[in-house]
A protein has these predicted regions:
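Extreme N-terminal starter segment of soluble prokaryotic enzymes
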Residues: 1-6
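Active-site beta-strand/loop signature of hydrolases that rely on acidic residues for catalysis
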Residues: 8-9, 25-43
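Non-transmembrane, interaction-prone segments in cytosolic or luminal domains
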Residues: 9, 13-16, 50
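Short, acidic/polar
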Residues: 14-27
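Short glycine-/acidic-enriched loop or helix-start segments at secondary-structure transitions
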Residues: 17, 43-45
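Structured beta-strand-rich core segments of catalytic domains in phosphoester-bond hydrolases
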Residues: 39, 46-98
Length: 98
């Protein structure tokens, strides 16, 4: 079995979307996608992750966008840092922090 893990420094998830990350995702749909520098508040991440979930549905990886497991940590300072993780694989538990 092959497991595809992708990591990407997005330098802002909204900027990445404008630059075509959705097209990249449609071609690749990794099993696990780790994102750094998401630079967005929670409500934006939730919306983007739903959009990305729709791509996983289109690619036959999951049945509904809600089946995409997501974990994220938003920076308390607006427009800074932030990380996110998407996977269509089951997540047993998560921990935020070191």
């Amino acid at each position: 079995m092959t497991l595809t893990i992708t990591t990407a420094n997005l330098n802002g998830i909204r900027a990445a979307k404008r630059k075509g990350v959705s097209k990249w995702l449609a071609r690749n749909t990794p099993d696990i996608w780790c994102m750094q520098e998401t630079r967005a508040p929670q409500e934006i991440l939730d919306e983007m992750f739903q959009d990305f979930g729709a791509t996983y549905v289109e690619q036959g990886r999951i049945a509904t966008p809600d089946d995409l497991a997501t974990v994220d940590d938003v920076c308390r300072i607006k427009g800074r840092a932030g990380v996110g993780l998407l996977t269509h694989r089951p997540v047993e538990r998560t921990r935020i922090g070191l």
